[in-house]
């Protein structure tokens, strides 16, 4: 099963590299990607939510969710699965950015975004805080 997933990934990533990747778009993609590094964007937004009383609970829930997500993803699951990053496993794939973390799955970027979004959605009531 993992071989099938790897083959599909390789095909899609090489197609994107050859068909979609444009030199003028690379800086935008790199910037967008770095926003998610270390959950920085979500941490900054969560800290900002702590500054206003109506959104304080949302900010605290978000920071807690980010911490739990980090522990589950980066400390527990990634070391167990140890799926290599595509640019180390796919021959001919040229990365725009590289990472110090050799494991690609599960995605820390996705975990952080999901954790923050889930916390925001779960703590904002219809009459209460709005984000």
Task: Describe the role of every protein-language-model region.
Residues 45-73:
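Interfacial segments of alpha-helical transmembrane regions
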Residues 35-38, 63, 128-131:
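Alpha-helical transmembrane segments
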Residues 1-40, 74-101:
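N-terminal transmembrane-helix/juxtamembrane module of multi-pass inner/ER membrane proteins
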Residues 49, 73, 77-82, 121, ...:
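Membrane-water interface at transmembrane helix exits
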Residues 40, 56, 60-61, 104-106:
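Short alpha-helix boundary/capping motifs
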Residues 52-54, 68-69, 83-89, 115-116:
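Short alpha-helical linear motifs
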Residues 45, 93-131:
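Membrane-embedded catalytic cores of phosphoryl/pyrophosphoryl-handling enzymes
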Residues 24, 54-59, 125-131:
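Membrane-helix interface segments
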């Amino acid at each position: 099963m993992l071989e099938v997933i790897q083959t599909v990934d390789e095909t899609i990533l090489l197609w994107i590299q050859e068909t979609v990747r444009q030199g003028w778009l690379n800086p935008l993609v790199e910037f967008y990607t770095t926003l998610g590094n270390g959950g920085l964007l979500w941490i900054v937004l969560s800290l900002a939510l702590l500054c206003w009383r109506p959104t304080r609970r949302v900010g605290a829930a978000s920071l807690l969710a980010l911490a739990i997500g980090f522990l589950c993803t980066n400390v527990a699951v990634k070391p167990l699965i140890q799926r290599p990053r595509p640019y180390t496993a796919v021959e001919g794939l040229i990365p725009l950015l590289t990472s110090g973390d050799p494991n690609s799955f599960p995605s820390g970027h996705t975990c952080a975004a999901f954790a923050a979004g889930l916390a925001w959605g779960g703590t904002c009531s219809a009459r209460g805080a709005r984000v």
